[in-house]
Amino acid sequence: MHRIAIYSIGKKDEKCYEAIYEDLIKNSKKFALIETKNVFNKKINAAQSDAQKAMKAYSDTFKPFILSDGFNIALDPEGKCLDSFAFANLLKEHTKLAFFIGGAYGLERSFVQSCDMALSLSPLTMSHKIAKMVLLEQLFRGLSIIHNHPYHK
């Protein structure tokens, strides 16, 4: 059974997104325990007018969630792009994972480099809410590929 945590910068998700997230997590339940956590604090709020300060605040907030006994993946536009089969292979190799989705300014280079991998979901820019949705869908698809579930045809 996979254990997957997804951390993203932000306050509570809107209901329209939350319903989709919950559906994808529910579909993945037989293969993985997936937890999502939005993080937002005073330091992040105070730093929003300065990109460098904001990225530092995101990194400082995420650091306690880095897994010492798992595989840490930073979502980053300069990260590696994988197709669904390569992503499934990544899931096959690692059963305990943490994904980090930055805020509006992305993540500090030093934080990205401290992770085991930088992953790009697409060359397109997308909001962290859409990125989380795409990630959850690809997690379900990858787990379906591994377990020969008919979702991925």
Curated annotation (Swiss-Prot):
The record's EC number reads 2.1.1.177
Q: Which residues make up the binding site for S-adenosyl-L-methionine?
A: L75, G102, L121, S122, P123, L124, T125, M126
Q: Which InterPro entries match?
A: Alpha/beta_knot_MTases (IPR029028), RlmH-like (IPR003742), tRNA_m1G_MTases_N (IPR029026)
Alphabetical keyword list? Cytoplasm, Methyltransferase, rRNA processing, S-adenosyl-L-methionine, Transferase
Q: Which reaction does it catalyse?
A: pseudouridine(1915) in 23S rRNA + S-adenosyl-L-methionine = N(3)-methylpseudouridine(1915) in 23S rRNA + S-adenosyl-L-homocysteine + H(+)
Where does the UniProt annotation locate this protein?
A: Cytoplasm
Keyword Methyltransferase among record annotations: yes
* Keyword Signal applies: no
The molecular function terms in GO held by this entry are:
rRNA (pseudouridine-N3-)-methyltransferase activity
Region forming the signal peptide = none
A GO cellular-component term linked to this record: cytoplasm
Instruction: Say what the protein does.
Output: Specifically methylates the pseudouridine at position 1915 (m3Psi1915) in 23S rRNA.
Family recorded in the similarity comment: Belongs to the RNA methyltransferase RlmH family.
Which HAMAP family does the annotation name?
A: 23SrRNA_methyltr_H (MF_00658)
| Subunit and partners | Homodimer.
This chain's protein is named: Ribosomal RNA large subunit methyltransferase H
Q: What is the source species?
A: Nitratiruptor sp. (strain SB155-2)
